[in-house]
Amino acid sequence: CSEKEQSNCFKRIRACWNGIMGKSLSKTFVRRTAAACRNCQSTCPKAGITPAPRADFSLRPGAYYGGDTGNIFAVLDGELEGDPVIFCAHMDVVEPWSGKKSVLEKDGTIHSAGDTVLGADDISGILEILYGVQLVLDSGKPHKKIEILFTIGEELYVKGSDVFDYSKVTAKQAYVLDLSEETTFNIGTIQGGTATNIVPDCCVLTAYETPLESKSVTDFQKACEILGFSGGLTGTFGGSDNNSFAKNGIEGLVLSNGMYNAHSTREYTTVDDLYKGAELIGQLILL
């Protein structure tokens, strides 16, 4: 179908979504962030999150390092040929998280009670992926195969995605929902010097950069244009699960998922950001 048909379809879906499913989305987020444990496998049923129809969500043997779950890899078969896209978000959250309680304000802002983190980093990414897939299924539009990876240990130097078996992945491009408004400097590898008793003449820091002409970038820009979003591109010095995709030959982008003041008790998100994130995921699937 044409871009105009896709755009009109999503406008109709959004109207239905806002009218019928809006409360479901915000309430799901509040329940999910208020759940007692930190992993998606045991928490999703408590939060009212169920796998999308026809989706094969199964727990893969992940990198166990003292937690109570592994990475979760999901595949949803599609009707169209072509390389699938993989969407990724991480399940772990930072301290303080125990006893967290989420508050939904009338203006659509969601925050914690003030004594814990909210967990929008990265629960908002998980929900946007799940609801984005649901938008596509509800639209009835044919789509390519969809792959999803929910990782463990991202906050502990991407431990989960670092040891994941990427032979399971057939996607050639990835979208990682884990970008906040600012981040800290992170170096992946450092090389320099020849001996411990000699001052090195130089130090080489290797960085990863997704080319502007790559398909992941152009598809993102196209999806934003169809939806009327003013999406922009920016560099980031932070580490994320996208680093692991890059090491395994999968190009990708880290997308904003509507989290603010991450890693603090002032963390918050908004219902509107969750909607837009889900719509963006859905549009990327249909490209």
List the model feature ranges, each with a label.
Residues 75-119:
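Catalytic-core environment of secreted peptidases
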Residues 28, 180-287:
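Metal-dependent amide/peptide-bond hydrolase catalytic core
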Residues 5, 10-45:
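N-terminal hydrophobic or amphipathic helices/low-complexity stretches enriched
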Residues 98-100, 158-163, 200:
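Short acidic, glycine/serine/threonine-rich loops at helix termini
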